[in-house]
Amino acid sequence: MSNLWTPSIEVESVNGTREVSLTTRHLMNRNVFLQGTIDSDMANQFLSQLLYLEQELEEPVTIYINSPGGEVNAGLVIYDAIQGSNLEINMICTGMAASMAAILFCSFFSVRFSSSL
């Protein structure tokens, strides 16, 4: 997984304004990203995000995938987590989905390629 800098943004709440990472804000909006090489770190992060989102089943989750693939075992962790979830999940390919990422992407009924978000 990439160690890129993640920008912070301000969000309003009943307690005032607070700063959260953009990744956290996306998670609050039920958006999850699978970007980069699939490995055990990505699988563990994804699993923890999905388990968190399962606390509220009313709203669908959107997974954005852009990956050259990666480790089969890690990909199977992601696959099993999604297939075992009670969430309504949509998946969007925002670049490429090759190798293990293609297996994940093609295993869903609600998928699409995105030329623009």
Model regions: which residues?
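Terminal-region recognition feature
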Residues: 1-117
